[in-house]
Structures are given as C-alpha cells and as structure tokens.
Amino acid sequence: MEAEKFVLITGCSEGGIGNALALKFHQEGFQVLATARQVERMDNLTKAGLQTLKLDVTDEDSVREVEQEVRKFTNGSLHYLINNAGAPCSAPAIDLDIEDVSKVMDVNFYGVIRMNKAFQHQLIRAKGTIVNVNSLVSYVPFAFNAAYNASKAALLAYSNTLRIELAPFGVQVTSIMTGGVQTKIQSKPLGTMTEAAIPENSIYYPYRKLILENRNPVEKFVTIEEFADAAYPQLVGRGRWYQLFKPGVRPAQIWAGYMSSAGRVGSMLPVEVFSMSVRLIVKLPSTAVWRDHTVD
C-alpha cells in the first residue's frame, strides 16, 4: 500500500484557486491540509473531509504555529507546499499608495518566503515540491496593476533562484503561471478597480471611465475547477512528455488559465512588443491631455 502523501495549501477560501486545488488533490487521494485566514470560509472543504487550519502568512507566529500543527499530521514529511495566498491591488502605477503596495508584497512575496523557510525541513525530509502560484503578469505589464505585477515578478525571480538552491536537497520548485481565472479575488477591497482608485488629482482622472470600461474580460476566464484540472497532472508528474520517462521531474513553470498561452509566447518577445499590445487592449490614448493640478 502506497504511503500517505501530504499537501499543504495556503489561501483556500471558497471560490478561489487554492480551494479548487485542495479539492482536486483530495479527490486524487492526497491528505490535504487547507489553510486560510478565516476557517469558516473553507466550510465546503471541511464538509468534504479535508483538514482545515487557520493561517495568516503575514504573521510569523501564525506560520510557526501552523508548522508545528502540520508536523503532527505529516510526521515531519510534507510532500507539497502550495503557496497560493494572494492579495490584489489595482491602481495607476503613478498613484500607488506605499501602504497598499506594502500589504500586497507582504502577502504575495514575503508570505511565501515565510512559509518556505518554516517548512523547509519537512519538505527536505519528503523530497517534496514547493509550488508558488504566480501569474503571467510577472512577465506581462498589465496596465493599472503595477503593485500586483511587481509582487509576482519578485516572486518569480525568488522561485527561480530557490529552484537552483534547493535542488541538491531533493526539493523541487515549480511556478504556476496563472492566466485569467474566475476567482473571488476581484471582490476584495484592492482587487476591483473603481473610480476611487483614480483620485481627482490623478493624471488619469479624465480617462477614468475609459480605463474602467476596458478592464479584464472576466467572462472569458477559466473556472477554478478547469484551472485545477489543467495544473494537477503536471504537478504530480504526468502532464509533460518528458514526465513519461522521468515522472519525478516537476517543470519549472506551468502555464494555465485564460491567455496563459499568449503570455508564455509573450515572455519570449521584446518588452516593447507586449507593451504595445497591452496599450491597445486597455485602449489608452496615444497622446494624453494633461492638466497641471499644482497650478491654480
């Protein structure tokens, strides 16, 4: 009989990617430890028989307590750590509030570092895999999303370095380059771009309606279940041709979600090419009218 394999996933609130991945791994026979800041938001997982734990990735004490709790279940061997917890931030780059940027970085980047550091020994013992849920915006300069883009770009650079450094210990690192997915992240305070994100003294104020009208086409995004179904085989060693011969090998990057294929191609193109495409998508004027608000 095959030994139990344990998966720890952050950011598992219902309606999100983490929740769908938790259910997928559970259905495939893994022992899943699902976490979120509010346990009641994982009621569907609890009813499905999954173990749920309260975790705030921005809190060192919370991370430490969960590591100790998880150790009781895993006996010190964690096979997958999926860092999915994320925070959005939508606003013009030039108008960003440092406090908002700090909050996004604390979850999307520093939170991942905290988790990997805390669980390193459990992962090494199991020869496990770290999965950092990233986004194609780490390559693609999606307009009016600069803080989120920057947090994911930092995460990608960190992940690529971590992959090299942990290889001698038998721990693999994979980045899921996420395209458009229908999640509840857009409903969070900083996730939905509203007119409030463009103050009257902003240089974009005259174009606020145009900007809001041309945000991402959520209706075209894949569902969280479709995303989980696409990512899972590659995470467990069955989705790439070379995994037929080396099933233990995990890809450095997995691309899944709406426009992820275009993002993959775009990552190999000059930045100028993709920047031009994004400008056309958001319909920014080639020349903007500027009014100096510093002058009465």
Curated annotation (Swiss-Prot):
GO terms for biological process: phosphatidic acid biosynthetic process; triglyceride catabolic process. A motif (GXSXG) lies at residues 11-15. It is found in: Lipid droplet; Cytoplasm; Vacuole; Endoplasmic reticulum. It catalyses: 1-hexadecanoyl-sn-glycero-3-phosphate + NADP(+) = 1-hexadecanoylglycerone 3-phosphate + NADPH + H(+); a 1-acylglycerone 3-phosphate + NADPH + H(+) = a 1-acyl-sn-glycero-3-phosphate + NADP(+); a triacylglycerol + H2O = a diacylglycerol + a fatty acid + H(+). NADP(+) binds at residues 9, 35, 41, 56, 84, 117, 148, 152, 181, 183. InterPro entries: NAD(P)-bd_dom_sf, Sc_DH/Rdtase_CS, SDR_fam. Its EC number is 1.1.1.101, 3.1.1.3. CDD domains: 17beta-HSD-like_SDR_c. Its main location: other. Keywords: Cytoplasm, Endoplasmic reticulum, Golgi apparatus, Hydrolase, Lipid degradation, Lipid droplet, Lipid metabolism, Membrane, Mitochondrion, Mitochondrion outer membrane, NADP, Oxidoreductase, Vacuole. It comes from the Eukaryota. The keyword Flavoprotein does not apply. Pfam families: adh_short (PF00106). Belongs to the short-chain dehydrogenases/reductases (SDR) family. This is NADPH-dependent 1-acyldihydroxyacetone phosphate reductase. It comes from Schizosaccharomyces pombe (strain 972 / ATCC 24843).
